[in-house]
Amino acid sequence: MKFKIEAQAENTAARAGIISTAHGEIPTPIFMPVGTVGSVKAVHQCELRDDVKAAIILGNTYHLYLRPGMEIIEKAGGLHKFIGWERPILTDSGGFQVFSLSSNRKLKEEGAWFRSHIDGSKHLFTPEKVVDIQRSIGSDIMMALDECPPGTSDYDYARKSLSLTHRWLERGWKHFNETSPKYGFSQAFFPIVQGCVYPDLRRESAKFVADLGAEGNAIGGLAVGEPAEKMYEMIEVVNDILPEGKPRYLMGVGTPANILEAVDRGVDMMDCVMPTRNGRNGMLFTSRGIMNMRNKKWADDFSPLDEEGTAWVDHEYSKAYVRHLFVANEILAMQIASIHNLAFYLWLVTEARQHIISGDFKQWKEEMVVRVTNRL
């Protein structure tokens, strides 16, 4: 994997670049649709490719390990072939999912014990096993196993958690360098900065991660209950330390405004389930603001779903029709909304990239943050 910075914005840390992988190039800043179990919910791969214009998607180690399992994925020749996706894939280590299980998991020095949410069976994720699973998946970018503590964690817990994450990271990094890809193309390994909302812990973790010299670095443990301003502060603290010449991936973030603020602070990659999850519940994000498609105000609005939208669905269907589909609980409503929201998110980061290159990102961003938070 290679990363080239093409432009640096003035009066801001925002930058535009290109990540080169075995499965293609990724223009940055980039938003990555989440395909947890090998599927972006309600969206075909051809729609992701041609309509949404996704350059990279996510898969999740925890979910893919449990179902369909590594034997099936290996027989298929890796996740790319299994799901019919020729562009890059990033896989999360599953650490966040294990953390989310709460009462059904135990963290030990050896790794994370957990019970499957599917059948209750007991499993152990070690830093080494998570690398092996992601070798079997064949993702272009794999993540280190970490603990993702709640944003409300006290300092003592946050420090203990960070120490465990760093010890796991050393083991995972060592194992990554001692193993080889299974499908004939290179894979990158991203370590994850943790430390909750404590600046000294974030600095310590960022330095630890930077010193590894991995091909890219991730920022985890944010957007987990802390105020947005605290999240932005932690991004600044971390990005002051992480090397400029490596891509920076902010995990699990967020709203359109969150994404713009993260890019402003030097983040290159982001992912979140929000555009698809909220879309399935009738919330549409647009360049003019947020629409709740269940609201009666759209019942007789026959204008296009989004006059400024880039997706086919934006101009093919009216607001009234999509509102009708949601009220009638039709599956098509979820599909249309998911495609629209993902296309909007990809449009947003593409526009951000263009404004970084043209030199007016800061002014554009300030105007856009106001617009995208407006309730229509």
What are these regions (language model features)?
Residues 138, 169, 173-176, 180, ...:
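Structural signal for hydrophobic packing residues in well-ordered secondary-structure cores
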Residues 151-155, 159, 216-222, 331-334:
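Glycine- and acidic
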Residues 1-18, 26-33, 41-42, 146-152, ...:
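C-terminal extensions of enzymes
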Residues 1-182, 296-299:
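Non-catalytic, usually N-terminal nucleic-acid engagement modules in DNA/RNA processing proteins
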Residues 129, 133, 137, 160, ...:
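A non-catalytic, amphipathic alpha-helix used as a structural packing/dimerization or gating element
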Residues 163, 175, 179, 187-305:
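Glycine-rich phosphate/ribose-binding loops and adjacent secondary-structure elements
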Residues 24, 57, 92, 134, ...:
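Conserved, mostly hydrophobic/aromatic
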